[in-house]
């Protein structure tokens, strides 16, 4: 071998070794990075882990969105009433910017017959006051938490990378590098990780084992396929926007988010339905919701506005909510049953094709939830309302 050939060989050898070294290094860091993630709230972690623990193609419908999903849709109610399996891919404050990547994630992981995308949180941040009128620190802190609750519970994938790309620069104004290579952001947590934690993590990752994560036993949906219902009650004035047609156009930058969702819905084979759940809406938001409905329908995309159907659903604003935005167990059952029937009829959904073991698992979760949450919850709500009436309250 002459000197020139030897030099070329040496350079190529060093280059290949360097590439292999960094490939192994980054591969190892990517593999162990989830071990160092911050613990997030039990609802987001529980909801998303419930989704990932399900056998692929065992779920007919996935509801995507913020708390306006997990406080309104009860999977076991849908199963008992219609024989349809559903799960909630939801976390508090989920931004519309995250949803295109999450639609791909849901299809890749579960491939359901239908994805229902709830848009109330998207509309909530539409038409608000200018950014300079907000407390920027509080805005940053809130959005940081909302994004973390999603991506910290996702496996490393192109879809996770897209969610980060679509949210971190636009909502936080941050460089996405630390989020994409999350070891840069979380490596300081090493001191909280024990060797047994590492062994347990490695065993689960290498085996492909998936389970519902119940942080400190606080995730109340762990035994109920993600059902998260509250048994308290808060009085709200009755509202009815069924005949209200006024609209107000949303800002261009928010319209871009909606356009991306429309394009995504049209580009996938999976059926996509956009929806808003019912609540004591104000006129300030109703005009934007009407605009969004018209815009989606004009673009050939399906939209179901529950705020136009409160009478049909049977919503009682005085006793079906536990705060101004979310249904309690009594209201959640009403919404689940009504929307469930709409989905079954519109999309010709048939009973789920489950294994015998899965059928027993779903029925067991339904029975357990009915006994431990639904029955005592409705009873507690009715007793609370009765006490208010006995005290002379005119609200009930």
Each predicted region: which residue ranges?
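N-terminal Lys/Arg-rich, disordered targeting/topogenic segments
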Residues: 1-12
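Hydrophobic membrane-insertion alpha-helices, especially the h-region
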Residues: 10-34
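Alpha-helical transmembrane signal-anchor/signal-peptide segments
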Residues: 33-57
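Catalytic nucleophile-elbow at a beta strand-turn-alpha helix junction centered on a G-D-S/GDSL motif
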Residues: 58-72, 326-329
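Membrane-embedded segments
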Residues: 64, 68-157
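Acidic-and-aromatic substrate-binding clefts and catalytic sites of carbohydrate-active enzymes
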Residues: 93-97, 248-254, 280-287
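Secreted/periplasmic serine-hydrolase-like ester/acetyl group-modifying domain
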Residues: 136-268, 356-396
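C-terminal regions of proteins
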Residues: 284-367, 371-391
